[in-house]
Amino acid sequence: MISRFEFADNVVGIIIDRDVDKKMLHEVHDLLRSKFKQSAVINLYVEIKPGVKIPVPLLVKDLIFQLRNNGKFNKLAIVTNQDFVRNIMKFRDFVMDADVEIFTPENRIRAMNWIAE
């Protein structure tokens, strides 16, 4: 189970507070697919709590999902203190049409404000 919230019809937030597995990734992708049906383009806020592990194969699978749905993302705000995840997200900024910003947990309010604009 993931924690989720919405700022508006086109803005969805996800908080990940436990290690990511295939089931959780599938749940996130299902949520995003349902949001795509409601709004042609969405802003996505993802907060990854400290200590959460995300296996590399699942990061790649998620990148493939986002690339397949590239035109459906307007902004991605990623909040994490994990350097490895931050670097992967910086790479996404180069390959996706969406604006991708990475924030530290201390700047999570700034991330929420940015994604809601």
Regions found by a protein language model. Name each.
Residues M1-E117:
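Amphipathic, Lys/Arg-enriched alpha-helical "gate/interface" segment within cytosolic domains
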